[in-house]
Amino acid sequence: MRILKSHPLLRLANSYIIDSPQPSNISYLWNFGSLLAFCLVIQIITGVTLAMHYNPSVLEAFNSVEHIMRDVNNGWLIRYLHANTASAFFFIVYLHMGRGLYYGSYRAPRTLVWTLGVIIFILMIVTAFLGYVLPYGQMSLWGATVITNLMSAIPWIGQDIVEFLWGGFSVNNATLNRFFALHFVLPFVLAALALMHLIALHDSAGSGNPLGVSGNFDRLPFAPYFIFKDLITIFLFILGLSIFVFFAPNILGDSENYVVANPMQTPPAIVPEWYLLPFYAILRSIPNKLLGVIAMFAAIVILLVMPFTDLGRSRGIQFRPLSKIAYYFFIANFLILMKLGAKHVESPFIEFGQISTVLYFSHFVIIVPLVSLIENTLVDLHLHNTLSLKNVF
C-alpha cells in the first residue's frame, strides 16, 4: 500500500477513490455519480466503435447505420447499448439533480460543484441532439431542421447563423460531417468537465449527507465500503439496461427514424427524445418564436439561481414540510411538461403548457424564496414563544 501514498499518480487516485473520507450516513441516493461515470464510459466505448463503421453523408448515413445493424459483428448490440444508455444517462442525471435540489447540494460551499453540474447538463443536451441527427432518418432530419432553425429567431443575424450551422441552405453533407465531428469530441469534453466536477466536490467540503449537517463527525474511507455500495447499484443498473437492450431496444425511440430521411415529406409530428420533452414543451408554449427560444434556454440556466433564491437556514428540505410540498409540486409539474412535449400543438395542450411553464419558472424565482421566508418566520416565532415560556417558568 506504500506505493499508493508515494507515487504521484497513484497518490492522486488514492485520495479520490480509496482513502477519500465520506459521511457514514449517505444513502443510495449518493450512488448516482458512479452510475453516471459508468454510463459515460459505456457511451465513449460504444460511440468510438460505432464511429468506425459510420459514414457521415446524406446518401450513406442511413445505410451505414443499417450496415452496422445487419453486417457488423454484434453491431446491433453496440448500437442499442449506445441508444439506451443515452436514455439511462439522462434518467440518472434527472435523479441526481432531483436529489441535489432536495438535499440542498447547490448551497455553499458546493455552489461551484452545482454550477459545473449545470454546465455538464447543457453539454449533455447538445451532445444528445447532435447524436440524434446522425442516423439520418425522418425524425433526425426534421429534428435537426426545426432545432437549428430556432437560431433564426435571433434578430438580424439569425438566418446567417442557421446557414453557418448547416454549412449550406439546408441540412446537407456539411451538416452531418460537423455534427458527427462534434458528437465524437464532446463526450471527451464531458469527461473532463466531470473530472472538474469531482475535483470541485473533493476540494470544497466533500459529499453532503441526508441530515444536511457537517459530515466531519463520522466518516469512513471510500474503499472498501462505498466501492462495494457503488458496485451494487452498478450491477442493478446493468440488469435494468440489459432488459431494455435485449427485450425492448426501440421502446424509447421513434419508429419514424427507421424511415430514410426525406426532405420533401414532413412527419406527422416532430418530437425529440423523451428526455428533452419538458424543454420542448416550454419552447412551444410561447407563441413568439424568440421568446420561446429564450424561455427554453432559461429553463436550464435558471438552475443556477437556486443557491441565491433558497433563503432557508438549513441545508436541504428534509426538515422543511412546506418546501417539501413545493418540491413535489415542482416534480409533478416537470413530468406534466414532459407529457405535454409529446402532444400536438392544439387546445387544451397549449393552455396547459403555458400554465406549467409559468409554474416551472415561478418555482425558482417566487415559490422557493417565499416558502423559505415563511419557514424562517415560523421557526423564529417558535423560538420566541419557547424563550417566553422559559422566562415565565
Swiss-Prot record:
Keywords: Electron transport, Heme, Iron, Membrane, Metal-binding, Mitochondrion, Mitochondrion inner membrane, Respiratory chain, Transmembrane, Transmembrane helix, Transport, Ubiquinone. The chain crosses the membrane at residues 32-52, 76-98, 113-133, 179-199, 226-246, 290-310, 322-342, 349-369. The keyword Secreted does not apply. GO terms for biological process: mitochondrial electron transport, ubiquinol to cytochrome c. It is found in: Mitochondrion inner membrane. Its cofactor is heme b. Pfam families: Cytochrom_B_C, Cytochrome_B. InterPro entries: Cyt_b/b6_C, Cyt_b/b6_C_sf, Cyt_b/b6_N, Cytb/b6-like_sf, Cytochrome_b, Cytochrome_b_C_euk/bac, Cytochrome_b_N_euk/bac, Di-haem_cyt_TM. One of its GO terms (cellular component) is mitochondrial inner membrane. Gene3D superfamilies: Cytochrome Bc1 Complex, Chain C (1.20.810.10). Binds 2 heme b groups non-covalently. Heme b b562 binds at H82, H183. Heme b b566 binds at H96, H197. A ubiquinone binds at H202. The keyword Disulfide bond does not apply. One of its GO terms (molecular function) is metal ion binding. It is a multi-pass membrane protein. Heme 1 (or BL or b562) is low-potential and absorbs at about 562 nm, and heme 2 (or BH or b566) is high-potential and absorbs at about 566 nm. Component of the ubiquinol-cytochrome c reductase complex (complex III or cytochrome b-c1 complex) that is part of the mitochondrial respiratory chain. The b-c1 complex mediates electron transfer from ubiquinol to cytochrome c. Contributes to the generation of a proton gradient across the mitochondrial membrane that is then used for ATP synthesis. Fungal cytochrome b-c1 complex contains 10 subunits; 3 respiratory subunits, 2 core proteins and 5 low-molecular weight proteins. Cytochrome b-c1 complex is a homodimer. Belongs to the cytochrome b family. This is Cytochrome b. The lineage of its organism: Eukaryota, Fungi, Dikarya, Ascomycota, Pezizomycotina. The gene is COB.
